[in-house]
Amino acid sequence: MAVTMADITKLRKMTGAGMMDCKNALTEAEGDYDKAMEIIRKKGQAVAAKRSERDASEGCVLAKTTGDYAVVIALKCETDFVAQNADFVKLTQDILDLAVANKCKTLDEVKALPMGNGTVQDAVVDRSGITGEKMELDGYMTVEGTSTAVYNHMNRNGLCTIVAFNKNVDDQLAKQVAMQIAAMNPIAIDEDGVSEEVKEKEIAVAIEKTKAEQVQKAVEAALKKANINPAHVDSEEHMESNMAKGWITAEDIAKAKEIIATVSAEKAAHLPEQMIQNIAKGRLGKFLKEVCLLNQEDIMDAKKTVREVLAAADPELKVLDFKRFTLKAE
C-alpha cells in the first residue's frame, strides 16, 4: 500500500523517530503501525547502542509529592524534539509514579522496578530504540518530612525542586520556598550545611582577591602620582596600542613598568594581615548569605530573608531538606 504523508506524520508523533525512518518502516510494514513501531524500535536500539558516548543533555525532569515524601527524577535524551514527545513525557511520569509508590532509595532501585514485560531500564532502552537517541535516567533524589512540596519551573520539565518541612505548611508558602530553591539555587539550608572544605576554599579565594585589590590600589595611586593614566598601562597590549595613538610615550611605558614592579612587590610585602582577614571574612559572610537558603533574600519580598518569612508563618517551622535538579549547566 502507498504510504501517505499523514501516515508518516502520525507515526512520527507516536515515536519521535525521523521522517525517513517512519516512511521506511511503514513501507516495510505495509502500513501496519504496530509492525512499523517494532521495526523502528529494533533499528533504533542498534543506533542508540552506537550513540552510548553521545551527550544526552535534553530530557524531561518531573517531581511528585505524596505529602510526607517527595521525589524528583529525569529521563534524558539528545534532542528537545524527543524530550517534548508525549510518549517520552508519559514514560518519565510512569517511572516517577513507580518510584514514589515503591519509595525507592536509589536510582538503581528505580531501574530494577518491574515495568511492562521487563524492568524500568528495559522500558528506557525500548524508548531509546524507537527514537534512535541515547537515553538515560538521572537526577533521582528524595526528601521526607511531615510535609513536602514540589515545583516544576514554568511547567517546562527542565528544572524541578523538592523540599521537606518539619510541620504542615500552607500550600502557597511551601510552593514559594520550592520556587526560591529553583530561582536562587542554594547549596545548603544554613551555614551548618556548608562543608568546612567549601568555607576554607572560599576564604582562601577571598584572601587572595583582597590582597590583589590592595596591591592594585597602591599601584594605581603611584601611577596617578606620576601623571600616568593606569588604564593606559594595564596590559602590554594597551601599552602598545596607546603608544601608537600617541597617548603615552616609550618613556612613560618604561616608567610605568618600573612603578608597577616596585610598588607591587613593596605593597605585597607589607599588607596589613588583620585588615585582609576582616575583608575576607566579610566576603565569606556574603557568600554564605547567597548560598544558604535561610539567609537568602526572599524572592517575593527582598526586604526579608527566607528565615524571616518562615518565622513569621510559624516560629517552629523548619526546612528539613531540599533537592534541585536541572538539565541546563549553570
From Swiss-Prot:
Recorded GO MF terms: translation elongation factor activity
Organismal lineage: Bacteria, Pseudomonadati, Bacteroidota, Bacteroidia, Bacteroidales
Organism: Bacteroides thetaiotaomicron (strain ATCC 29148 / DSM 2079 / JCM 5827 / CCUG 10774 / NCTC 10582 / VPI-5482 / E50)
Subcellular localization(s) per the UniProt record: Cytoplasm
One GO CC term, this protein: cytoplasm
Reported function: Associates with the EF-Tu.GDP complex and induces the exchange of GDP to GTP. It remains bound to the aminoacyl-tRNA.EF-Tu.GTP complex up to the GTP hydrolysis stage on the ribosome.
Protein name: Elongation factor Ts
Predominant cellular place of this UniProt entry's protein: cytoplasm
Top-level taxon of origin: Bacteria
Gene label: tsf
Pfam family, one: EF_TS
